[in-house]
Amino acid sequence: MIDCKIIRVFPRRTAWTPESPLVFIGDPPLFRPPEMPVKISVTFTWDIPEGQRLQRAWEQYYSDVQIGGPAFGDPGNDFTPGRFIKEGVTFTSRGCPNNCPWCFVPEREGKIRELEITNGWIVQDNNLLACSNYHIRKVFEMLMAQNKAVTFSGGLEARRLKSWHIELFKKIKVPELWFACDTPASLKYLKRANDLLGDFPTRKKRCYVMIGYKENLASAERRLKNVYALGFLPFSQLYQPKTKRIKYSQEWRDLNRHWSRPALYREKPRTKGE
């Protein structure tokens, strides 16, 4: 159950921001709730200065104002649905057993940790398929009871995909399955995943493709084309480090724009079902 007696403040509104009379974006309003704890949640490191400014602003009216969130290395020890993220989102695990050099999840959250399963239909786990078989099956039992279309927005690791996972996917409503291909070495696992997903149309097979990490423009474009050729819809994302943001050239931005919009790169109209 959501603790209704906490004011939650965010530096900016995103698609994940919860809706509540006690959720605020930015400075304290003219008409404010009565005295209660205030928690300022900062997701991105570049928003830390704004979060700290907001802490000072809210401290003018409330005695207990705390600041935290992913930007401050919060390991996510527990998860309360709807408190700091919108209704429907659930985390059933934290962390990741991989050690990808561009990813801050293992440093912040540690290795994979299974949490108590809470209801939801937007699964935001960083690496659900790295969990135990028992946990994965229990997650799908929960999802089957939701009677809603399920999104695995945290992504699925192609290397860990197995045939019995596919059977579980077929038991729920899945508009799309999200994978990732952040290096050329990942392509072989994506090909194997595509073979396992033979009954799923192209429009349901989607792939985050991080570009710009220790590679040139030609290499990034080649990987994007390969992902598409394997039967997935690539969605390009420019790499950004944890702290200082990279200012990419127009060429990089154009490449990213083209390959993050299927309407721009799809070569021809697909047949029905694709």
For each of these PLM feature ranges, what is it?
Residues 23-30, 161-169, 190, 217-223:
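Short, acidic/polar
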Residues 1-64:
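A short, structured N-terminal alpha-helical element that caps or precedes a catalytic domain
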Residues 171, 176-178, 185-274:
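A structural motif corresponding to the C-terminal lobe/cap of the Radical SAM core domain
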Residues 16-19, 29-35, 71-80, 113-119:
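Short loop/helix-cap segments at secondary-structure boundaries that form the rim of catalytic
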Residues 1-12, 80-109, 118-125, 129-130:
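N-terminal pre-triad scaffold of radical SAM enzymes
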Residues 58-65, 148, 201-203, 232:
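A short helix->loop->beta-strand "cap" motif at the edges of active sites that frequently abuts
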Residues 8, 39-45, 104-193, 203-213, ...:
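Core AdoMet radical
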Residues 61-75:
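Short beta-strand elements of ligand-binding domains
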